[in-house]
Amino acid sequence: MPRRPLLEFEKPLVELEQQIEQIRQRARDSEVDVSPQLHQLETLAARRREEIFKSLTPAQKIQVARHPHRPSTLDYIQMLCDDWVELHGDRRGSDDQALIGGIGRLGDRAVLLIGHQKGRDTKENVARNFGMATPGGYRKALRLMDHANRFGLPILSFIDTPGAYAGLLAEEQGQGEAIAVNLREMFRFRVPIIATVIGEGGSGGALGIGVADKLLMFEHSVYTVASPEACASILWRDAGKASEAASALKITGPDLLSLGVVDEVLPEPVGGNHWAPLEAGEILKEALTRNLEGLLQLSEDALREQRYRKFRAMGQFLDDLSPEALMAE
């Protein structure tokens, strides 16, 4: 088994991981039965990892969300769907590789799947622009969502981006307009939409495919108006205060659930989704199937009205009203 990169706060596990690897190597090189010793060390490592991950700070959760081995949109699509056909292009000369989409089947139901896609290494990250979509990417997503709306396909989106690409060319090509049009049109769609934050959900880049009837996020994912580094640079002119900004921004699942921004926080395997991708895929599949079945019971008008009220309730503050009460108004 290839060794996974350990995060800074996992360093107390380094010695245990080294011992486990040495025992595995010994087992490969000889016929000595080391399974009892190996089981004991693996159990100890799992227990210590569970203790560490139960008390992560927001800044540490960001590290987990950005882990290079964390499952990506394509990884989840392959786990969710037996059949998957990727669709390309925005029909305006662009086929952004940072935002992908296509048709697949969740169980026996045809669905549209779209999402940000990061790379596994430097070369792939450059090709995918580190998951930062250009205007062409958001226009491609809109074209595919229009297709889904026309043919009655539920839309499943997967959010994993530090933000929309903010380069000069992206601004010249209308980045703000592309995202704004997506927001407007997603409110009008007559089909169920479920968005899931699988890694980091940053700013307008996340919102561009994030207007949904149900917004889910994994336990160690983050969803934020701006990255903590950017926030610290803007407020304090010091990116070194990113950890302080992360706590103030309320970017974690429990905080966002209490604020009414997300609808469900999905548990992760001990150590994060990168430690057990298949288990993470099963958790996601169950949540998507369950939420989709509920949404399919609603009429088109009820879907759109509920979606509108959900987002109108965000950002309002009244002493005597909870987010649930605001949505009921």
Curated annotation (Swiss-Prot):
Reactions performed catalytically: N(6)-carboxybiotinyl-L-lysyl-[protein] + acetyl-CoA = N(6)-biotinyl-L-lysyl-[protein] + malonyl-CoA
Source organism of this protein record: Synechococcus sp. (strain WH7803)
NCBIfam families per UniProt: accA, AccA_sub, PRK05724.1
Known role: Component of the acetyl coenzyme A carboxylase (ACC) complex. First, biotin carboxylase catalyzes the carboxylation of biotin on its carrier protein (BCCP) and then the CO(2) group is transferred by the carboxyltransferase to acetyl-CoA to form malonyl-CoA.
Enzyme nomenclature, EC number: 2.1.3.15
InterPro entries according to UniProt: Acetyl_CoA_COase_a_su, ClpP/crotonase-like_dom_sf, COA_CT_C
Name of protein: Acetyl-coenzyme A carboxylase carboxyl transferase subunit alpha
This protein's record includes keyword Disulfide bond: no
One Pfam family cited in the UniProt record for this chain: ACCA
One annotated GO biological process: malonyl-CoA biosynthetic process
Alphabetical keyword list: ATP-binding, Cytoplasm, Fatty acid biosynthesis, Fatty acid metabolism, Lipid biosynthesis, Lipid metabolism, Nucleotide-binding, Transferase
Keyword Magnesium: no
